[in-house]
């Protein structure tokens, strides 16, 4: 298999991290933005942009409100998919897999690294629920600011999700739409990866 150059390597997470590092100085903003897909109880898909915060040795991590629609759908199905797409590189990575919570020390550390206003905002926002007005949201921000001051703890309803892939596809633009695609797949998280080149 002619998997060389930007596709070379035996570790798909290392390849993904390398592509992201390459995109960071070139994308106009948010090179770590992913389009995260879930399905509701009726099987109707939902997709939204969130920020990928970590590429681990065996997983991808993002953070959110556990009461949000995305979180409810993830915890109902235990599965999610996302795509990372970079116009500057003309490349993308697609991921499908199983999801688990990250609500321990790692989530605490990431929450603590955020700006104070973002930490207070996590307390103030009942994410995905109806909101009467922006004024009422700002009033809630003022209330939690008065309550916590400059040291708000991480809310129990806010934390991370770790996506452990069963499938990762790397795609790069090719001339005349003769793109390069390589798919890594495994049947379970304990299995090794099989790799195949796909038609454009």
Curated annotation (Swiss-Prot):
The protein's required cofactors: FMN
Record-level Gene Ontology MF annotations: FMN binding; pyridoxamine phosphate oxidase activity
Keyword vocabulary terms for this entry: Flavoprotein, FMN, Oxidoreductase, Pyridoxine biosynthesis
Catalytic reaction annotation: pyridoxamine 5'-phosphate + O2 + H2O = pyridoxal 5'-phosphate + H2O2 + NH4(+); pyridoxine 5'-phosphate + O2 = pyridoxal 5'-phosphate + H2O2
Cofactor note: Binds 1 FMN per subunit.
InterPro entries linked: Pyridox_Oxase (IPR000659), Pyridox_Oxase_CS (IPR019740), Pyridox_Oxase_N (IPR011576), Pyridoxamine_oxidase_dimer_C (IPR019576), Split_barrel_FMN-bd (IPR012349)
Residues noted as binding FMN in the record, renumbered to the chain: 48-53, 63-64, 70, 92, 127-128, 171, 181
Associated pathway: Cofactor metabolism; pyridoxal 5'-phosphate salvage; pyridoxal 5'-phosphate from pyridoxamine 5'-phosphate: step 1/1; Cofactor metabolism; pyridoxal 5'-phosphate salvage; pyridoxal 5'-phosphate from pyridoxine 5'-phosphate: step 1/1
Single Gene Ontology BP annotation: pyridoxine biosynthetic process
E.C. number: 1.4.3.5
Stored PANTHER family: PYRIDOXINE-5'-PHOSPHATE OXIDASE, PYRIDOXINE-5-PHOSPHATE OXIDASE
Assembly mode: Homodimer.
Stated family: Belongs to the pyridoxamine 5'-phosphate oxidase family.
Descriptive protein name: Pyridoxine/pyridoxamine 5'-phosphate oxidase
Species per Swiss-Prot/TrEMBL record: Cereibacter sphaeroides (strain ATCC 17023 / DSM 158 / JCM 6121 / CCUG 31486 / LMG 2827 / NBRC 12203 / NCIMB 8253 / ATH 2.4.1.)
